[in-house]
């Protein structure tokens, strides 16, 4: 559902009072404009008041998500807004009431069941209870804009795992870095959608936005070629119980339907210049990833356990937000009121030293310098009971592909599990390797 001319129809907020000597330096607009920085915020404020006056409740975890409760105290509808676009789900009665409610205050364009949203395509398999998100249209349009086509042997990974992108030396930078920055921005938009497989790559490319060189531009075009070759893949969510098996029995675990499982990993001293490590995390529900992130650590870790603990701290922050979100979005109003305790979130960690430091308060000699994040994790792990940290083997650590460039076989093994890609959708060049 869309609100055409949403910003233009809104009341213009009061501007500053210019000094008399600066009267000629200001222009007074008669309405809010899309080009003004405060225009989306002004419309959101109007929309927020409109929703709350009808009984919709915004989430504290995300102010753009609203919940409507029925007379029985159960959730009847959920609306997620993005400026002038909205996706709504709920009962048939609640959706009919929502349409009337929106039409009473706005001129709306109702597209029915969403098939495109923010550059993502959405398909539904109601018989098998599956939903797929992918970005084929956006990726093909991006490749056409940059005149990039598939070669006879398309890349199997978004980044060459045998090469590191090093900083540009004086005199080697591109004459005009504008095109390179456009490459990175276009790839990043795909990553913000559903292409988690390029998450680490776009982080590496973005480090060289100021002074890119020819090698950086070639790496960016390589990534776009990879996206074009795999434009048909996406994230598929399923409903139902299932179990995952790995080659090492001790590394295997059962993923429960409807339960959020989190994975965190770190690549120790990944940056060849600063020797700072890279943190990555991913949260999975209903067979596929729902949130993910990659971030360079701000301080140099002294060991792999040190780097993993800092990555665990970043993952814990995401877990805090997810814990709050699932409480607020729960179908039962009593759960949102903190009257019912939710089960702990499970975080899978592949470093035993890190798990020991968290679970054993006597282990402190090697972690005195990171005492604050450690105590934060221990508090959630022990006293609050919000986290459950479990060991998982390195070969089964799904977040490994977020912290480093991997060989094709390993890359696709992890990406297939994270995105829940059926074997039939895998690129021809990796089907055999991924199936073994």
Regions found by a protein language model. Name each.
Residues 1, 7-69, 73-101, 174-200, ...:
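Conserved pre-motif C helix in the palm subdomain of viral-like polymerases
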Residues 29, 33, 37, 113-239, ...:
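C-terminal reverse transcriptase regions that engage the nucleic-acid substrate
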Residues 48-52, 66, 99, 103, ...:
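Amphipathic alpha-helical interaction motifs in eukaryotic regulatory proteins
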Residues 61-64, 166-175, 186, 247, ...:
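Active-site-adjacent structural elements in folded domains
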Residues 102-111:
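A common structural junction motif
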Residues 208, 259, 298-436:
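RNase H-like nuclease module associated with reverse transcription
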Residues 225-266, 338-341:
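Structured nucleic-acid-interacting core domains from mobile-element enzymes and related host factors
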Residues 254-255, 259-307:
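RNase H-like nuclease fold core
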């Amino acid at each position: 559902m869309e609100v055409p001319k949403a910003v233009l129809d809104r009341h213009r907020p009061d501007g500053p009072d210019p000094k008399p000597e600066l009267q000629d330096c200001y222009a007074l607009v008669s309405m809010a404009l899309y080009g003004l920085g405060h225009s989306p915020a002004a419309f959101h404020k109007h929309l927020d008041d409109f929703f709350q006056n009808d009984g919709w409740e915004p989430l504290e975890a995300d102010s753009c998500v609203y919940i409507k409760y029925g007379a029985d105290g159960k959730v009847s509808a959920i609306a997620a807004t993005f400026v002038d676009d909205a996706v709504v789900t709920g009962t048939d009665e609640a959706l009919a009431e929502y349409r009337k409610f929106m039409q009473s205050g706005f001129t709306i364009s109702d597209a029915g069941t969403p098939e495109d949203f923010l550059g993502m395509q959405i398909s539904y398999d109601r018989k098998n209870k599956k939903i797929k998100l992918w970005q084929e249209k956006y990726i093909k349009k991006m490749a056409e804009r940059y005149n990039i086509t598939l070669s006879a042997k398309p890349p199997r990974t978004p980044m060459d795992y045998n090469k590191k992108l090093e900083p540009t030396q004086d005199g080697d930078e591109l004459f005009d870095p504008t095109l390179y920055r456009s490459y990175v921005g276009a790839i990043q938009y795909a990553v913000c959608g559903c292409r988690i497989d390029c998450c680490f790559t776009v982080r590496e490319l973005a480090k060289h936005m100021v002074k890119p060189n020819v090698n950086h531009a070639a790496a960016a075009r390589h990534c776009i070629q990879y996206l074009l070759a795999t434009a048909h893949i996406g994230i598929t969510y399923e409903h139902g119980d299932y179990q995952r098996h790995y080659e090492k029995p001790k590394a295997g675990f059962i993923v429960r339907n409807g339960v959020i499982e989190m994975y965190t990993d770190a690549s120790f001293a990944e940056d060849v210049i600063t020797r700072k490590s890279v943190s990555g995390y991913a949260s999975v529900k209903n067979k596929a990833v729902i949130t993910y992130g990659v971030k360079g650590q701000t301080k140099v870790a002294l060991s792999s356990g040190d780097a993993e603990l800092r990555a665990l701290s970043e993952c814990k922050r995401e877990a805090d937000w997810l814990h709050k979100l699932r409480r607020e979005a729960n179908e039962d109003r009593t759960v949102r009121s903190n009257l019912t305790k939710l089960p702990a979130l499970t975080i899978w960690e592949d470093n035993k030293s890190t798990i020991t430091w968290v679970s054993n308060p006597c282990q402190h000699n090697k972690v005195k310098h990171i005492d604050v994040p450690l105590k934060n994790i221990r508090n959630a792990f022990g006293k609050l009971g919000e986290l459950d940290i479990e060991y998982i083997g390195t070969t089964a650590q799904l977040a490994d592909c977020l912290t480093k460039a991997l060989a094709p076989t390993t890359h696709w093994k992890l990406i297939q599990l994270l995105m829940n890609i059926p074997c039939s959708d895998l690129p021809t060049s990796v089907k055999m390797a991924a199936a073994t």
